[in-house]
């Protein structure tokens, strides 16, 4: 059984730059303790005869075929641009050469 202390939660929250109240730290300590207990249960399973896999279920390529289609009209798109030049979006310079 794993006990996560409120202090551990506060330390991890501090490292992650998260603010947690005393009440939240206490609640999270209990929740994280339960999660770790479940993971420890999984560690007791015998997986010697389980074939390694990257997915829990069989996955086939479900992506659509890459087919070129007509895009948006350039003038229609650029009419909403704050600035354009030579048929392209013009953006402020952020780096000098």
From Swiss-Prot:
Top-level enzyme category: ligase
Family, as annotated: Belongs to the GatC family.
GO molecular function term, any single one: ATP binding
InterPro entries, per database record: Asp/Glu-ADT_sf_sub_c (IPR036113), GatC (IPR003837)
Name the UniProt record assigns to this protein: Aspartyl/glutamyl-tRNA(Asn/Gln) amidotransferase subunit C
Reactions it catalyzes: L-glutamyl-tRNA(Gln) + L-glutamine + ATP + H2O = L-glutaminyl-tRNA(Gln) + L-glutamate + ADP + phosphate + H(+); L-aspartyl-tRNA(Asn) + L-glutamine + ATP + H2O = L-asparaginyl-tRNA(Asn) + L-glutamate + ADP + phosphate + 2 H(+)
PANTHER family in alphabetical order: GLUTAMYL-TRNA(GLN) AMIDOTRANSFERASE SUBUNIT C, MITOCHONDRIAL (PTHR15004:SF0)
HAMAP family: GatC (MF_00122)
One Pfam family named in its UniProt record: GatC
Keyword annotations of the record: ATP-binding, Ligase, Nucleotide-binding, Protein biosynthesis
Biological-process GO terms, alphabetical: glutaminyl-tRNAGln biosynthesis via transamidation; regulation of translational fidelity; translation
The EC number(s) this enzyme carries: 6.3.5.-
Known function: Allows the formation of correctly charged Asn-tRNA(Asn) or Gln-tRNA(Gln) through the transamidation of misacylated Asp-tRNA(Asn) or Glu-tRNA(Gln) in organisms which lack either or both of asparaginyl-tRNA or glutaminyl-tRNA synthetases. The reaction takes place in the presence of glutamine and ATP through an activated phospho-Asp-tRNA(Asn) or phospho-Glu-tRNA(Gln).
Subunit and interaction comment: Heterotrimer of A, B and C subunits.
